[in-house]
Amino acid sequence: MSSYAYVTVIYGNNIYLTGALVLGYTLQQTNTKYDRVILATKDVSEEYRSYLKKYYTHIIDIDYVKVNEDIFLEENTRFHDVFTKLSCLSLTQYDKIILLDLDMIIAKNIDHLFKLSAPAACLKRFHIPYGQKIPPKMICSNGKLVGSINAGLMLLEPDKREWEDIKKDIVKENFIGKFKYPEQDYLSLRYCNKWTSITFNYNFQFGLTHRVKKYHYTIDNIYVIHFSSSYKPWNRLNSDKSLREDETDFFDQHIKYYNLWMNIYSKIKHDFSKNDIKLPY
């Protein structure tokens, strides 16, 4: 077992399986030296796990993590189970982990990120040079959030005591505040004076066109592509789901990124079909 690992999380049986396969496949293609771990809630079926084994070195069972509902700023939030992904902090067999969202493509090898001090992530809205400490004043002031990191890609150090403390914290009745992006805002505040900067080309959200233009990022000089909007690439695989006009416009505007994801997924389906295996999507 390596001292470092890439970690992602899958909840239940649903179309997010496609994201997990694309993420795992692209990680594998970068020839990383380190483990590729997927944490799976116990309602992920054996069938789905059999697909995931092709691209992940370890599949580890986890339980859903519940929180005090007062933590959510939006009543019908899509982030109800999002703190479950912080179960990765219990993986103390690793010195450091990189936690990744499923809606990502790893375009180039990123093993060098493990050399940074943890915790590390990309600061939203502002540029801090790679590897530098993010000034606390850009994240919090007087115990309140004024900025945030993006939690789609984070370098973390597993710590079971820290994880137990977080689990106690997020069920408190007198929780510190309401968050639109719950685990992201919570961790931003919790580690306000500890964050190291990972630059935008390691968490490339192509929908943020002002940042894309300002720093001249293109599909050729980025490491990780993040489909962070609600317009997920696998929506096009779901024939039962009709796209809204704004979704269609967004897809059309950023078609090269969605086509890249679709081409990778088509290759994955083809690889499985060689063994007479038909994926559910």
Swiss-Prot record:
What is the membrane topology noted in the UniProt record heading this document? Single-pass membrane protein
Protein name per Swiss-Prot or TrEMBL: Uncharacterized protein R707
Source superkingdom: Viruses
GO MF term set = glycosyltransferase activity
List the GO terms this entry assigns under cellular component, sorted alphabetically. Answer: membrane
> Mind telling me which residue stretches traverse the membrane in this protein?
5-27
Please verify whether the record's keywords include Transmembrane: yes
**SUPFAM superfamilies given for it?**
Nucleotide-diphospho-sugar transferases
* Location in the cell: Membrane
Keyword set, alphabetical order: Membrane, Transmembrane, Transmembrane helix
